[in-house]
Amino acid sequence: MKKKIIFASIFFLLITVSSQFIFHLDIKRQSYDTKIINISGKQRTYSQQITKIALYANEVKNLYRYYIDLDSLSTIVDDFSQDNYYLKNITSKNYKNETTDALFKENQVYFNKIVNAANRTIDNPDSQEIFEEFVTKIKANEAKFSATMDNLVNEYEAISKRKLAGFRKILTLYGVVTVVFLIFVIWFIIIPLYKKSKTLESH
């Protein structure tokens, strides 16, 4: 009986510690996935903001340099690039998936064209030719960038759902193990101890 109690205590401790560890990992994973999805969504916003600045300034043609907000454009491009760097590292290290790899690779083509054109405009604020090239690049690549980023967001969400489904299976397994453990404790420890106490009382 003593061995059974020791075994039950150790097993209970293992279940408790391991379940807490798994819960902690899943909460961290959910937070992580949410951050990835949010940053991906922000990338679409940045590309739209760059487009808005370019098209607004383009409306005034030769006077564009008096209307284009280079400070805002520079800030947006910096944020756009930093988040892209983060996504690039996360995608290559933590999302080993052919679909995300292919989508991100395609997305980078459009991203680089947008950023390179924007940076040339920022570095050459008095060049109408460079500005017009910037507008052309934006018109040719922004929609494609947003489309591939939409597909990436959808894929990240699908991966997150698959992970959640796997976590639910683990929870089910833990539930089954816990029930079996309780049956063991009741049948092999509590009931025998109860019978033993009754026997002692009768004497």
What does each model-identified segment do?
Residues 158-201:
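Selective recognition of signaling/oligomerization transmembrane alpha-helices
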Residues 17-21, 46-49, 53, 76-79, ...:
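Amphipathic, well-ordered alpha-helical segments in soluble domains
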Residues 42, 105-166:
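Extracytoplasmic
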Residues 17-31, 119-129:
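Short, charged/polar, low-complexity loop and linker segments
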Residues 3, 25, 29-32, 155, ...:
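Juxtamembrane loop-transmembrane helix junctions in multi-pass integral membrane proteins
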Residues 26-51, 64-74:
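Juxtamembrane membrane-water interface segments immediately C-terminal to a transmembrane helix
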Residues 1-26, 176-180, 185-186:
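Extreme N-terminal signal-anchor transmembrane helix of membrane signaling/transducer proteins, especially
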Residues 70-131:
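Heptad-repeat alpha-helical coiled-coil/4-helix-bundle sensor or tether segments in soluble regions
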